Amino acid sequence: MIGLFKVKEKQREESQSNNGRGASTVKKQSAGELRLHKDISELNLPKSCKISFPNGKNDLMNFEVTIKPDEGYYLSGNFVFSFQVSNMYPHEAPKVKCKTKVYHPNIDLEGNVCLNILREDWKPVLNINTVIYGLFHLFTEPNYEDPLNHEAAAVLRDNPKTFEYNVRRAMMGGQVGQTSFPRCM
């Protein structure tokens, strides 16, 4: 990760040294990009979370976070989330989708995530680290009171043992009800 930020710093230095001597090779960063750069450089992730940049080092605004819970119903699963960050960040929350199809009360089958800090509770003082910890918390403490997947929420609320069985079955690549899930363990 440090290498990524050294590349960005070198590009900034080259841009400054070219000042007045031809076109700059680096575009000017928006306030959102600068804030995101700061947030990423200050990330303090648990060992069970990893960040990657599938579009390369020059696209910090789109990245993926992989969460591998080390406790709870989702123990040992691998869940990938895509983050799209607009230039309006931090005044606008990042767009987060779960790329891994998962049986979860707070994540629907299309990957939409129900996390209050990504909606009505977003504030500019929050950062990417806060969002990642929020996602991690969804796997250690799924919330049946604010669901996107109402069926999973009802099972969690009414029969936690059946919910645990369904989660394991889904994570092993099985079927829950009429829905098939890819293996994610």
From Swiss-Prot:
* Biological pathway: Protein modification; protein neddylation
GO MF annotations, alphabetized: ATP binding; transferase activity
Q: Where is this region: Disordered?
A: 8-29
Q: Which SMART domains match?
A: UBCc (SM00212)
Tell me which EC number(s) this protein carries: 2.3.2.-
Domain named UBC core: residues: 31-176
Q: Which PROSITE patterns match?
A: UBC_1, UBC_2
Pfam families per record = UQ_con
Q: Which InterPro entries match?
A: UBQ-conjugat_E2_core, UBQ-conjugating_AS, UBQ-conjugating_enzyme/RWD
Q: Which family does it belong to?
A: Belongs to the ubiquitin-conjugating enzyme family. UBC12 subfamily.
Q: What is this protein called?
A: Probable NEDD8-conjugating enzyme Ubc12-like
